[in-house]
Amino acid sequence: MPNHLPSLALVALAILPGPAFALEDSYLPADKIPYAVEAPGQPQRLGPLWGERAKGPAGTLLKVPGNWRAPVHAHTADYRAIVIKGLWAHWQMQGGEATKVELPPGSYWTQKANEMHDDACLSDTECVILLINDTP
């Protein structure tokens, strides 16, 4: 399986706001990312890469098992996302009809705050998504 992380890291750097680069050099090997359960009883896990998503600008990896689907939901902040691993689907609920878009690794989407949407991992194996937010 090809490693998309180097090219996706360049994409992430290209879309990050300028102030995010005022950091010291830091490294976080993939096997050291401190994943935590997002919600009790749910399988999705969050791995913080930089910042704190509950406080401000942040980059976070989301891991979900294969064939997982979220309920229709909304977030309190805008976010950008890049598919790292697996086949992802994202639905917009605008106009009362959902429009599903399938997103393979390397794909990108944005989501506005307070807009209802749905997400799913269509792969049989886990999906990994890079979530980037500027506000909590």
Describe the residue ranges of each PLM region.
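Bacterial N-terminal signal peptides
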Residues: 8-17
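Glycine- and acidic-residue-biased ligand/ion/polar-headgroup-sensing regions
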Residues: 65-66, 75-95
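Conserved hydrophobic/aromatic beta-strand scaffold that supports enzyme active sites
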Residues: 48, 59-63, 80, 100, ...
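Short acidic-glycine-tyrosine-enriched beta hairpin
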Residues: 54, 88, 95-114
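Ligand-binding loop in jelly-roll beta-barrel domains
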Residues: 113-136
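Conserved short histidine dyad/triad with adjacent acidic residue
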Residues: 58-75, 103, 112-113
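Bacterial N-terminal signal peptides that target proteins for export
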Residues: 1-9
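A short, N-terminal "cap"/entry segment at the start of jelly-roll beta-barrel domains
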Residues: 20-58, 101
